[in-house]
């Protein structure tokens, strides 16, 4: 079967699924709630907010030292900052931060994507939220930590790599800062690792729906030299969602040829 025939076959399956959503079986063991997942571990430090999936830790600094603010070269100086950092995950954390700034009086002042994934093919993340009141910043980090149980839902991995999809009907300031996504419009993020899988996913997404390319990153151009290809798209919410789902299906199929069936650790939300 040629690659075009494979794409056509998967797109037909995706369109059928979108038109007639499948009934998902109720799992025997309910997954932990976002509240439980955020509070898996704790400590007595006032700066500590919580932990979450992806070796993620949330911290706050109520009154940042001015010398550190100068050295960090943040776009805006805030007295209080929130820190969302992880060994594994970039898209889930950016999407979670996007929800955090929608829900709180905070702003994303820095997003960095270190080469990490604990030796895997992708990124970790370091996201800084700023605010004039430490209670606002802490609340923003709390929201982001809770959102990670949702935003990790469409991350699928096996021993060979991973694929990741993110979708929102209304992009906010974190997606705008990270990728240049138009604020207020639907946005999708499509990631494939190894990068070869990501390139095919990107092509499939663009062929499956009428969407606009916002950004494209590859190992030597914008991914901190991770073995990933990343496509960010915008457009009508239905079209963006269809494009993301099409990319997910072909990505799972190809990644599965390199190892075991790719699995997600949280329920899919797209």
From Swiss-Prot:
Pfam families: BMC (PF00936). Pathway: Polyol metabolism; 1,2-propanediol degradation. Its main location: other. Changing residue 38 to A: PduB' no longer produced in E.coli. Disruption phenotype: When the whole pdu operon except this gene is expressed in E.coli no BMCs are made; with the whole operon many BMCs are produced in E.coli. Keywords: Bacterial microcompartment. Gene3D superfamilies: 3.30.70.1710. One of its GO terms (biological process) is propanediol catabolic process. In purified BMCs seen as a 30.0 kDa and 25.0 kDa form; the smaller form is called PduB'. One of its GO terms (cellular component) is bacterial microcompartment. Residues 47-152, 154-262 form the BMC circularly permuted domain. CDD domains: BMC_PduB_repeat1, BMC_PduB_repeat2. One of its GO terms (molecular function) is structural molecule activity. It comes from the Bacteria. Homotrimerizes to form a pseudohexamer with a central pore. The trimers pack into an array. Both forms interact with shell protein PduA. Has 2 BMC domains which can evolve independently of each other. This is Bacterial microcompartment shell protein PduB. It comes from Citrobacter freundii. The lineage of its organism: Bacteria, Pseudomonadati, Pseudomonadota, Gammaproteobacteria, Enterobacterales. The gene is pduB.
